[in-house]
Amino acid sequence: AIAFGGAVISGNTRITGTSVLWGEVYATDNVWIDNSEISQGAYISDSVTIHDSLVYGQCRIFGHALIDQHSMIVAAQGLTPDHQLLLQIYDRARVSASRIVHQAQIYGDAVVRYAFIEHRAEVFDFASIEGNEENNVWLCDCAKVYGHAQVKAGIEEDAIPTIHYSSQVAEYAIVEGNCVLKHHVLVGGNAVVRGGPILLDEHVVIQGESRITGAVIIENHVELTDHAVVEAFDGDTVHVRGPKVINGEERITRTPLAGLL
């Protein structure tokens, strides 16, 4: 292990393996850094563990956070309207085999595996982001995943969930496979969205016990709740345009005529 260029190491910090610390970094308290490179202003404290990973830039990693499996944490300000916000990973958050960049926030008991999380996106509470070696989950802009929500990639080609803009996945919702959430989308309750490809855009709320599967486009002020189902079969694409509320036991398996207008 080697430290230089203004690195400060204090407290009971352990630096092991082939670790390199340089460029005004600060490691203190009970931090353990193993086979990792930490540089350019990172501040790491409390009981953080970092294995086999890279941390670069002005960020704060604290609490009992764990970063491992060749994760890359690359902090950068100035790419969003909030110039002051620092990238932070804290509480009991765990980040594995992922890239966390810009000003993203990972905290609570969140678990992030095989993901690319950028801009000011947030994962917190007991949320789970679960990609795989083939497909990384992608969160960007001001997307949020929280509560007990799960966002999961599939193993097929393009089975990549992408959460954009101010979209949110919350409560006990599950979003899986080739799903794109764009402007003002909330998936909550016990809803299941399983693509795909699925596109949700422009003020779409999916909640209750509702379910969306197959090739589905839902856009423009649509609410799906209760036990409602939108399901596409055999290469068909179901397209639902609002304003519309789909509730009760309603089931849509083909494009409503009004949806074509």
Role assignments for model-derived ranges:
Residues 2-8:
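LRR N-terminal entry segment and analogous cap-like coil->beta motifs
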Residues 11-261:
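Glycine-rich hexapeptide-repeat left-handed beta-helix
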